[in-house]
């Protein structure tokens, strides 16, 4: 904890600036030697020359944060140099030569945690904000970083501590009967607390599934336009398009964002009877992808009459029993597909879309509207979020213990035992872990300079 550490806080690569962070008792002294300047007012920005052994390295913006008013709670210095990775490495090496050591992954955040600048829920939120790929969850993470999850947990903890104190008082006067109004009040209190915890847990589990991305399989007979549809949605030539049947022999997967939701597009091999062994394997993978997907795009060629392969596809869609968008492709050509017959054979709820892939942007817009209609409408503006398995496990244990406490209301010793166990589980959400090994494991997932 007393070491002075340094690291490059920005991604390696060329850009406008790179940031080098220094934290520890020697941070200010190192900055003075780097800049050959002695006076720094905390929280003021200075433009300074940066030297190493008397050799000029760069002109940079530097800021000194005096302990405890910094991210880590220690003296912190930031050097914002020009964004050349070689230059940033040279300045970092100069810091190391002056007595700093290279920071471990997540060590700045670990210092902030150990110095009580952030709790576990805020630490979790900070790393998830960096990793998050879902725009709709950013607000919930920002609110968690602000400390709203901590406030929620601490309020619940305070409520349970009051119940525990009341129970302990009654235990001390065990010769008297437990007041019935006390039991009713405590039971109602616990029910509300359990419900609020379950709401948080259910929302977090739903969000976790959503973060994996909605799997969308594109299926159809050969040459129906599946690969063209994929390319249109990606606005690039990702899949090979050919008039030769069986061109796509394996599944192709790409990730896009539609209206703040991550979508995994899976282009599949054309479904038909084939004597080609490799193509048959591709078709088997196509059918397998339908079992694991969330939404199906069933592609039909509007310019051709329905044939056996189309009816096989309809049977496949009916068996899959998944949300389905029936895409009638190639509507720029004269329509020959018997639409009413197609509709009569579909036995599942579906949405219908006529389009063509020649106009990629229009096609993408039409599909986005249809696909997004299947997305769950989640209110993340007013929701808190659990971001790790450890947090979810702790809350699940708290719920379990509260339910046990409620079941043992008339046996105060057991009630108090389960209530205390629930409080201890809540502590794991915001309060320090007990072993340094667990801390090291948690912060090792962070990046350098964080």
From Swiss-Prot:
Entries under SUPFAM superfamilies matching the protein: P-loop containing nucleoside triphosphate hydrolases (SSF52540)
Cofactor: K(+)
Stored Gene3D superfamilies: P-loop containing nucleotide triphosphate hydrolases, Probable tRNA modification gtpase trme, domain 1, tRNA modification GTPase MnmE domain 2
Cofactor notes: Binds 1 potassium ion per subunit.
Compartments, as annotated in UniProt: Cytoplasm
Binding-site positions, (6S)-5-formyl-5,6,7,8-tetrahydrofolate: 21, 78, 117, 450
Domain of life: Bacteria
Residues the entry annotates as binding GTP: 223-228, 242-248, 267-270
GO biological process, one term: tRNA methylation
Every TrmE-type G domain range: 213-376
UniProt-annotated binding residues for Mg(2+): 227, 248
EC number, as in UniProt: 3.6.-.-
Cysteines engaged in disulfide bonds, as pairs: none
Family listed: Belongs to the TRAFAC class TrmE-Era-EngA-EngB-Septin-like GTPase superfamily. TrmE GTPase family.
Assembly, per entry: Homodimer. Heterotetramer of two MnmE and two MnmG subunits.
Name of the protein: tRNA modification GTPase MnmE
Gene that this sequence comes from: mnmE
């Amino acid at each position: 904890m007393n070491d002075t550490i340094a690291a490059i806080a920005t991604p390696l690569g060329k850009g406008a600036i790179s940031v080098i962070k220094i934290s520890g008792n020697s941070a200010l002294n190192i900055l003075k030697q780097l800049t050959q300047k002695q006076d720094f007012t905390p929280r003021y920005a200075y433009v300074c020359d940066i030297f190493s052994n008397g050799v000029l390295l760069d002109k940079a913006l530097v800021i000194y944060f005096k302990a405890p008013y910094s991210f880590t709670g220690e003296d912190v210095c930031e050097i914002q140099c020009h964004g050349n990775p070689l230059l940033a490495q040279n300045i970092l090496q100069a810091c190391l030569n002056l007595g700093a050591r290279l920071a471990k992954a997540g060590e700045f955040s670990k210092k902030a945690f150990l110095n009580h600048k952030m709790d576990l829920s805020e630490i979790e939120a900070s790393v998830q904000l960096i990793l998050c790929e879902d725009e709709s969850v950013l607000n919930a993470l920002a609110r968690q970083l602000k400390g709203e999850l901590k406030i929620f947990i601490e309020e619940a903890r305070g409520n349970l501590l009051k119940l525990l104190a009341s129970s302990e008082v009654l235990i001390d006067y065990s010769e008297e009967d437990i007041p019935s109004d006390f039991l009713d009040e405590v039971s109602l209190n616990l029910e509300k607390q359990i419900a609020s915890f379950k709401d948080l847990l259910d929302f977090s589990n739903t969000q976790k599934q959503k973060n994996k991305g909605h799997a969308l399989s594109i299926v159809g007979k050969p040459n129906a336009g599946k690969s063209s549809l994929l390319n249109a949605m990606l606005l690039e030539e990702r899949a090979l398009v050919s008039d030769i049947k069986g061109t796509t022999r394996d599944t192709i997967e790409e990730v896009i964002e539609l209206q703040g939701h991550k979508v995994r597009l899976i282009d599949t091999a054309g479904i038909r009877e084939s004597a080609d062994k490799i193509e048959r394997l591709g078709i088997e993978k196509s059918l397998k992808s339908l079992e694991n997907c969330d939404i199906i795009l069933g592609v039909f060629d509007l310019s051709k009459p329905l044939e056996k392969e189309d009816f096989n596809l309809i049977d496949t869609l009916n068996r899959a029993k998944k949300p389905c968008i029936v895409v009638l492709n190639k509507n720029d050509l004269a329509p020959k597909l018997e639409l009413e017959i197609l509709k009569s054979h579909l036995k599942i709820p579906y949405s219908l879309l006529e389009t063509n892939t020649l106009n990629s942007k229009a096609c993408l817009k039409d599909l986005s509207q249809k696909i997004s209609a299947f997305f769950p409408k989640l209110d993340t503006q007013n929701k808190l979020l659990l971001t790790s398995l450890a947090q979810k496990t702790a809350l699940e244990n708290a719920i379990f213990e509260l339910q046990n406490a409620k079941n043992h209301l008339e046996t105060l010793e057991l009630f108090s035992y389960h209530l205390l166990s629930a409080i201890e589980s809540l502590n794991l959400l915001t309060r320090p872990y007990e072993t340094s090994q667990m801390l090291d494991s948690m912060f090792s997932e962070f990046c350098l300079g964080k």
